[in-house]
C-alpha cells in the first residue's frame, strides 16, 4: 500500500501531516507535481516531478496507482479515476470519496462549473482550518491502521 499525493494543490499543512505519518507508520508517501518540492529526508517519502501540462500529474498518479493505494487530492475527476481503478481517494479536508458518493460530487462540480461559466460568482473554498486538519488526520489514521492490520 502506498500513499500518492496530488501535490501541486495540496496545502503545506496537509503535506506535513503526511510526512509525519510516513515515518511513524513506515508507509511510502509519493508526491507528484509539475515542479520540484522540498521534502524531508526519509526513505519513506519520494518526489516525482512531471512535465507541466493539463492533468499530467493526475495521469501519472493513475498510471502508477495499485488497487488499495490511497490518493490525496481535491481534484474530483482524479478521485473518480482513482476509485474506478480500485484505489481510495481522500481530499485534504478529510472527505473520503467513495463509489457511493463520487457521482453526486462530480455532478455538483459540473453544475458549479456551469454556473461560473455563465458569470455567477461562486467563490472558492475557505482556508483549511483546525477541524478540517483533524478530519484529515483521523481519516488518514484509519487508513494506516487498517493497512497495518492486513
Curated annotation (Swiss-Prot):
InterPro entries, A to Z: UPF0178 (IPR003791)
Family under the similarity heading: Belongs to the UPF0178 family.
Protein name from the UniProt record: UPF0178 protein Ssed_1350
Protein's organism: Shewanella sediminis (strain HAW-EB3)
Lineage: Bacteria, Pseudomonadati, Pseudomonadota, Gammaproteobacteria, Alteromonadales
